From Swiss-Prot:
Name of the protein: Maturase K
Source lineage: Eukaryota, Viridiplantae, Streptophyta, Embryophyta, Tracheophyta
Source organism, top-level taxon: Eukaryota
GO CC terms in record: chloroplast
Leader sequence segment: none
A GO term for molecular function: RNA binding
Family indicated by similarity: Belongs to the intron maturase 2 family. MatK subfamily.
Localization: Plastid, Chloroplast
Species of provenance: Erica tetralix (Cross-leaved heath)
Annotated function: Usually encoded in the trnK tRNA gene intron. Probably assists in splicing its own and other chloroplast group II introns.
């Protein structure tokens, strides 16, 4: 454990200059102000004044700092909003802008860290990559030789102070942290910013960017234990260490593993039987070749580690141990499992020939049709058994808008599940959306689906649903064990930034 601490301190020593002066820079809040203006969540009040809002935000920042050093308890209470004219028209809008400004300022040291990592290295930069795309290499990797998997729900901090304390290792500017802490404690609804759920937690739409940044940084900190274990389990220390860092920081990972000619070799180093790891949002999958006893020790070790070193309350029931051979892996709407593929091998011995029955393991990824139909039913495209229905709330739109919305939803689903070899379930989803679109159009024109299709033809809908946009995508070639030729390429599109966005236009 002492060596693990030294590894952490070595990374944390790479700190940057003070960021406190940036809080007063006008261009920071101009950028944050522009981001908030693009949203309509806080701009419903008719009294909002665009010209004076940025000036009021700057005044508010100065006033907050003055009150902080005078130790005067002031900020955003319901009673004070009418007494103090500095708050202006919409205090929610100004607090949102301030939090956006915080997000811009605090992200600067980590952006500089990324640039220093990429400096002097030949990387193909792609700015449309998202962390959700990191699941593609995981689904392409053949992990059927592993025995057990840990299905982990990451514990969340019970107090925002824990998130702020984590930043101390990277931001050596104490004034910025004091100001951030002061603002968080005086903000009236900070307790409602974290919304607990049954299996995980999420942040409300208000100030989501800033709090997601704090949470993701906190998660990356206690993921560092896996970096340490990875360095201890490989003989190729430098390559293995860097490759595992790629799995944590997606921008570096995807550029190293996908866009270099040595992709296969680097991925092979990572697929060492000891550990296979992937995370997205609040869920972690940890696969290993170890026995059930070893995985159980892992389970209780992680619980103790999070509680003792990061003050995160976790329970063993949030970590499930499953055997990969008889358990399907449900991860981000991808249903993966290991199945036995029967094979017939012909053996020739002198004049006698024999047929030998055998089986090989294959890691398959399927489309979970039942949850998909449930999502479509919740969005009112079909009933609970998958029978298409019309979408009344869209009947007031133009015909082209209705068709485009349905086609957009299908393209999102199709691209998200594009890597599947068997697309039978996708055809069913297409049928539901296509017929729901036809019924919505027929409802608008006070007609029947049969009469509407005779008048315009269903070929019009088919054209919209099959029209593909020019989208950047990835392919992972697999080498044949006999001839070395490429086969079975699956396409993974990179235009997906959310999971099954069925209500994008709502």
């Amino acid at each position: 454990m002492e060596e693990f601490k030294r590894n952490l301190e070595l990374d944390r020593s790479q700190q940057y200059d003070f960021i406190y002066p940036l809080i007063f820079q006008e261009y920071i809040y101009a950028l944050a102000h522009d981001r908030v203006l693009k949203r309509s969540f806080f701009l419903e009040n008719a009294g909002y004044n665009d010209k004076s809002s940025l000036l009021i935000v700057k005044r508010l920042i100065t006033h907050l700092i003055t009150q902080m050093y005078q130790q005067n308890h002031f900020l955003f209470s319901v009673n004070d909003s009418k007494q103090n004219p500095i708050l202006g028209y919409n205090r929610n809008f100004y607090s949102q802008t301030i939090f956006e400004g915080f997000a811009v300022v605090v992200e600067i040291p980590f952006y500089l860290r990324l640039l220093s990592f990429l400096e002097g290295k030949e990387r193909v930069k792609s700015y449309n990559l998202r962390s959700i795309h990191s699941i593609f290499p995981f689904l392409e990797a053949q992990i059927f030789h592993l025995n057990n998997i840990l299905d982990i729900l990451i514990p969340h901090p019970i107090h925002l102070e824990i998130l702020v304390q984590t930043l101390r290792y990277w931001v050596k500017d104490a004034s910025s942290l004091h100001f951030l802490r002061f603002f968080l404690y005086k903000y009236p609804i900070w307790n409602s910013l974290i919304t607990p759920k049954k299996s995980s937690f999420s942040f409300s739409k208000r100030n989501q960017r800033f709090f997601l940044f704090l949470y993701n940084f906190h998660v990356s900190e206690y993921e560092s234990i896996f970096v340490f274990l990875r360095t201890q389990s490989s003989h190729l220390l430098s390559i293995s260490f860097e490759t595992f860092l790629e799995r944590i920081s997606f921008y570096k990972k995807i550029e190293l593993e996908v866009f270099t000619k040595s992709f296969k070799a680097i991925l092979w180093v990572f697929k060492e039987p000891f550990l296979h790891y992937v995370r997205y949002r609040g869920k972690v999958i940890l696969a290993s070749k170890g026995t059930s006893f070893l995985m159980n020790k892992w389970k209780y070790y992680l619980v103790s580690f999070w509680q003792c070193y990061f003050y995160i309350w976790s329970q063993p029931i949030r970590i499930h141990i499953n055997q990969l051979s008889n358990h399907s892996l449900d991860f981000l709407d991808y249903l993966s499992s290991v199945r036995l593929k029967p094979l017939m091998v012909r053996s020739q011995m002198i004049e006698n020939a024999f047929l030998i029955e055998t089986a090989s393991k294959k890691f398959d990824t399927l489309i979970p049709i039942t949850p998909m139909i449930g999502s479509l039913s919740k969005a009112q495209f079909c009933n609970v058994i998958g029978h298409p229905i019309s979408k009344p709330v869209w009947a007031a739109l133009s015909d082209s808008d209705i068709i485009e919305r349905f086609a957009h939803i299908y393209r999102n689903i199709s691209h998200y599940h594009s890597g599947y070899v068997k697309k039978k379930n996708l055809y069913r989803i297409k049928y539901i959306l296509r017929l729901s679109c036809a019924r919505t159009l027929a409802r608008k024109h006070k007609s029947t689906v049969r009469a509407f299709s005779k008048r315009l033809g269903m070929g019009l809908l088919e054209e919209f649903f099959t029209d593909e946009e020019q989208v950047f995508y990835l392919t992972f070639p697999k080498a044949s064990s006999t001839s070395g030729e490429l086969y079975g390429r699956r396409i993974w599109y990179l235009d997906i930034i959310c999971i099954n966005d069925l209500a994008n236009y709502e």
